[in-house]
Amino acid sequence: MMNLLSSDGVQVLPRPFTLNERRREVRSFVLRQGHFTPAQKRAFDHYWPRFGVDFIGQLRDLDVLFGRSAPKVLEVGFGNGAALRFAAQHEPRYDYIGIEVYAPGVGRLLNGLAEDGSRHVRLYHYDAVEVLNKEIVDGALDEIRIYFPDPWHKKRHHKRRLIQPLFATLLVRKLRVGGCLHMATDWADYAEQMWDVLDATPGLVNRAGLRGQVPCPDWRVQTRFERRGQNLGHRVWNLLYDRV
């Protein structure tokens, strides 16, 4: 999942990262490549031109990108893509944008989207902060979904967590009024931090009331991170905020 860096010296790649001759300078996340299968590598070659969006650092007209006018949903840090693929299968009236730096997960989702014949999904293999700041117009998104971001469970690492005040303010800017932000975590203290940050962010109101949570929505499939957490005895918190 997406892992933002603070200014505390966490190591990043010092030079551009190249995958299938597409160069990207990694700036603001920890790159975790994992095991990259031949099938996932082939997916980049075969399906990236169909579903992939290369970062150019310029604001985009999302209706032009998708070739139609439809509600736009962004998932930040889609992991292996299970939730995004499920949503695209079951809610085809939406256009979906996914952002993920974990290359094997991107490759797996590319294969799945091709298998499904999906038409209205676009993927970034890049840093979410850069994409949001430089390529997404303010107010362009109807919904943002962030499922099971890295909890950085050690207290000294909490400042590396994705959900921080500046990032929350960025999300508010990109959501249209009337849109919503949906987050899920299986770490109690991260849920507390999410409430602390989001309740203090102008432009967001918790749909379930102060420090409230909602049942798992129909649009979110259970992820492997959720199953892992449940096996460890963790609860899952679903937080849903409206953009006002």
UniProtKB/Swiss-Prot annotation:
What the protein does comes down to: Catalyzes the formation of N(7)-methylguanine at position 46 (m7G46) in tRNA.
One matching Pfam family = Methyltransf_4
Q: Which gene encodes it?
A: trmB
Annotated organism of origin: Xylella fastidiosa (strain M23)
- Residues that coordinate or bind substrate: K154, D186, T223, R224, F225, E226
EC no. given is 2.1.1.33
Q: What's the protein called, per UniProt?
A: tRNA (guanine-N(7)-)-methyltransferase
* PANTHER family according to UniProt: 3-DEOXY-D-MANNO-OCTULOSONIC-ACID TRANSFERASE/TRNA GUANINE-N 7 - -METHYLTRANSFERASE, PENTACOTRIPEPTIDE-REPEAT REGION OF PRORP DOMAIN-CONTAINING PROTEIN
InterPro entries noted in UniProt: SAM-dependent_MTases_sf, tRNA_(Gua-N-7)_MeTrfase_Trmb, tRNA_methyltr_TrmB_bact
The entry sums up its family as follows: Belongs to the class I-like SAM-binding methyltransferase superfamily. TrmB family.
